[in-house]
Amino acid sequence: MSDIMYPVCFDTLMNHIFKEYALHNRIFNVESIHRYEGSNTLSAFGVTMENPLGPAAGPHTQLAQNIVAAYVGGARFIELKTVQTMYGEELGIPRPCINSNDEAYNVEWSSEYRADEAMNEYIKAWFAVKLISKEFGFGDPTGFIFNMSVGYNLAGIKDPLIDGFIENLKKAGATQCWQSCKEWALQNLHRFTNVDAAYVESISDEICQSITLSTMHGCPANEIESICEYLITEKKLNVYLKCNPTLLGYDTVRELLDVTGFDYVTFDKHQFEVDPGMNDAVPMIQRLQKVAEGIGKQFGVKLTNTFPVTIGHGELPGEQMYMSGKSLFPLTI
C-alpha cells in the first residue's frame, strides 16, 4: 500500500458517488446510510445541526471522500484535519503511524497536505455533501457544520499560507476549486432529479465560521490565550480550544486509567509539569469567553486532545505515542 496520498478531482469524486449509489445503494462503502427524518436539532454558531456527532480532526477528515463517507454515515459536525505550515515529508511521520487494535495510538499529527491542498479537499467535500444531501434526501443541506482546525503556534497561524487557508474557508467563492465544483454541477444538471441551477447558485461559500485550535503539548498558557484571542478578534471566528487530558493532573489520570482497566498504559510526570494546569486553564477560558461575547462570537473547549504515553511494546515506531479512543474517554468525561 502506498503511503502517498493523491487527491481525487471533483468529477471523479461525484462520478464514483453516483455510480456506487446506483449500483449498490451505498457511498464509499458506507451501507447504513443515515437519513435524517427527525425534528430534534442543535444550534451552534447560528447553524442548525441535525445532530452534534461527527469525526474529530484526523486522517479520516483529511480527504474529500472520507468526509463524504462520514456525512452519509450520520456525521453532522465535522472537524477537518488540522493544518500547519509544515506538511508532507517535512513532518517526518514514521510508518505505520496509527495502531487501533484496541484503544488507539498514533504518532502522526497535522495534515500531510499543504494547507492550500487541504483546503481544496474540504471545498470538494462541502460541495459534494451539499449536492448529495439535496439529491438523495439524506437531510437538510444546511444541517451540518464544517469546523476547521489549525496549529500550532501564533507565528505559524499568521503565516500567509495558513492565513490564506483560514480566509478561503471562511468564504471560498473566489477560489479556483470552488469555481470548478460549481461549474461541474451546472454542467451535469441532467444527472440530477432534485438539484437545479437555482439550488447550485444558492450553495453557501461560507464553509467554516468556526475553528479549533490545536497546540503542541507543552505550549504555555499565555501563548494559547494569545492565539485564541487572535482568532476571535482578528479572524472573527467562533473558537474551540482543544484541551489536554493533563489538566487533570498526574495522580487523577493514573487513577482513572487504573480503575478502568488501562493500568498497563505508562507515562511519566514530565508532560504534566510542562502543560498548563487547571489553575491556568479555568481563568483563561473565562477571559476568552468574555472576549468572544464582546464581539458576538462564541468560545468553547473541545475535550480532549490526545494523551502522550510511552511506547513500551513496539506498538509504533519511536519512544512516545499519542493515545485516543476508548481509553481516552474516562479522562474526557
Model-identified regions with their sequence ranges:
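A structural motif corresponding to the C-terminal end of an alpha-helix
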Residues: 168, 203, 226-237, 280-299
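Active-site-proximal loop/turn and secondary-structure-junction residues that shape catalytic pockets
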Residues: 59-61, 84, 243-249, 305-309
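N-terminal capping/small domains of soluble enzymes
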Residues: 1-234
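Glycine/Thr-rich beta-alpha phosphate-binding loop at enzyme active sites
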Residues: 22-36, 249-333
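Extended, H/D-rich, highly charged conserved domains that either
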Residues: 219-236, 240-253, 268-279
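Conserved, mostly hydrophobic/aromatic
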Residues: 55, 241, 301
